[in-house]
A protein has these predicted regions:
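Non-catalytic pre-domain segments flanking phosphatase-related domains
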Residues: 1-32, 58, 227
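Mg2+-dependent phosphoryl-transfer enzymes with acidic/Ser/Thr/Gly-rich catalytic loops
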Residues: 21-29, 46, 206-292
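Short active-site oxyanion
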Residues: 60-64, 83-85, 170-172, 230-232, ...
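Short, structured coil segments at secondary-structure junctions
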Residues: 81-83, 90-91, 98, 190-193, ...
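Conserved acidic, metal-coordinating active-site core of Asp-based
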Residues: 119, 123-247, 256
Length: 292
């Protein structure tokens, strides 16, 4: 059996006299954000990222993707990296196998979704909705390729999103147009304590079911795989990644990460353009420098 490398977890115990000692454990699960962490706007993985993920899996470490994307949008990237364990999608609201089999799902209550639609329309915000694997919007404000590439391959234009609310949607996204701070503040003012509201990108303000975030999703998957929290590593770059970075035994923020993401992290990796995610995997899970 392959011996797992020592994982330099930041889980600590307090010794007598105030001394703190770091516990070294083997890494058994790595959760990786996609956009801004593993790939840039070109949606491509670098050779170094591919290599680090492949070696980790060869050594018996489970690697998953933790993203706000839908399963339909996530699975092609998972296939490229040959991810073998369930995927964390919709910010932790849905966990599924690569073959599409659902393991866990939380949905946004329809009456709350209707209120978000009303608020968005009153302000002229670009509101969109995910339901049953498809992506819906009332109008196109960007080229179709924008929605297909960054949000979901299955895009449907529906004049009134309320017509879809005969059952609960998975989540909603309001696409900012230079007004992201205003949207975030407005949603939180009206719906604080009723739903999870988070910024996942400069352009994307997400509305998820209350209690759903990448931290809760990673905790669910860790339990499903019987991996202790202390042996989990998470890497991300945005505010929506902060919960899983804070929850993991070792949380890593990208050098290009948001302030909230970095504040939650145990270690700051180099930025995306310097393959920061691969560097983190090599350093903390593989304990070896990258070699071609």
């Amino acid at each position: 059996m392959t011996r797992l490398p020592l994982f330099h977890s930041h889980a600590k115990r307090r010794e007598a006299g105030g001394r703190t000692e770091t516990i070294h454990l083997p890494c058994r699960l790595i959760a990786l954000d996609l956009d801004g962490t593993l790939m840039a706007l070109d949606l491509k993985f670098s050779p170094r990222v591919r290599h680090a993920v492949a070696v980790a899996q060869e050594r018996g470490i489970a690697v998953t993707l933790a993203t706000g994307r839908s399963p339909l949008s996530t699975c092609p990237f998972a296939a490229e990296l040959d991810i073998r364990v369930p995927l964390i999608c919709y910010q932790g609201g849905l966990i599924a196998q690569r073959d599409g089999r659902l393991l866990h799902r939380a949905t946004l209550e329809s009456h709350l979704a209707a209120q978000v639609i009303d608020l968005a329309q009153s302000h002229g915000w670009h509101v969109t909705l995910y339901q049953d694997g498809a992506f819906y919007l009332p109008e196109l404000r960007h080229p179709l390729s924008f929605y297909e590439g960054f949000l979901n391959p299955s895009v449907h234009q529906v004049a009134d999103l309320r017509s879809l609310l005969d059952h609960d949607p998975d989540k909603m996204i309001i696409i900012a147009q230079g007004n992201g701070d205003e949207i975030l503040a407005g949603l939180r003012e009206h719906f604080d304590g009723q739903m999870q509201i988070v910024r996942s990108h400069e352009l994307f303000i997400e509305v998820n079911p209350l209690g759903v975030d990448k931290g809760s999703g990673l905790a669910w998957l860790s339990n499903y795989l019987s991996v202790p929290q202390a042996q989990v590593m998470a890497v991300g770059d945005q505010d929506n990644d902060a919960p899983m970075i804070a929850w993991a035994g070792l949380g890593v923020a990208m050098g290009n990460g948001s302030p909230a993401c970095k504040a939650a992290a145990d270690w700051i990796a180099p930025p995306l353009e310097e393959d920061g995610a691969a560097v983190a995997i090599e350093r903390f899970a593989l304990n070896s420098p990258f070699t071609k």
